[in-house]
């Protein structure tokens, strides 16, 4: 197994013993589940972004963890964590904030937290990562004007269609 960091080491992804990627969503799942077991997960909640895999929501439902969704960007994750008193949050990209230790993403801290969880549980990362199933996910960017974005964001029919699709996928 191993860890990979971006250029300034604020992001961390892991590779399990079979060479499978363990992304930020799975790392947050593994670590937040351990925090919940140890009664250190504040309000039993993890903060994630709209980019998170639907598998994270299913993991939360199955494990009694609440997920709060923010816009993409660590600043939005941190803002929600500070506002509501949560202590773990992050992005699929591996940008994870552990508010008990820092107010920014720290890839090395993510690696240490992952290793500590492995040691406490006595299990490999491969085994721990099985706690969450990643579902196929596609990102499609659609260009819209700022006015169009505002109109779509506030359109009740669009909101209802999104909620209906999320409900179907999460059940």
Which residues make up each language-model segment?
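Short glycine/threonine-rich catalytic loop with a Thr-x-Gly-x-Asp
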Residues: 5-7, 21-26, 102-105
């Amino acid at each position: 197994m191993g860890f990979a960091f971006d250029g300034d080491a604020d992001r961390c992804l892991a590779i399990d013993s079979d060479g499978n990627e363990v992304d930020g969503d799975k790392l947050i799942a593994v670590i937040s589940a351990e925090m919940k077991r140890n009664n250190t997960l504040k309000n039993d909640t993890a903060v994630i972004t709209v980019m998170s895999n639907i598998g994270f929501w299913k993991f939360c439902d199955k494990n009694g963890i609440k997920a709060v969704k923010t816009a993409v960007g660590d600043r939005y994750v941190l803002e929600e964590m500070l506002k509501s008193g949560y202590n773990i949050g992050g992005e699929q990209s591996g940008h994870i904030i552990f508010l008990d230790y820092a107010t920014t993403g720290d890839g090395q801290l993510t690696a240490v937290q992952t290793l500590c969880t492995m040691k406490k549980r006595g299990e490999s990362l491969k085994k721990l990562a099985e706690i969450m199933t990643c579902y196929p996910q596609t990102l499609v960017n659609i260009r819209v004007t700022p006015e169009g974005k505002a109109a779509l964001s506030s359109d009740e029919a669009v909101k209802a269609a999104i909620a209906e699709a999320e409900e179907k996928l999460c059940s």
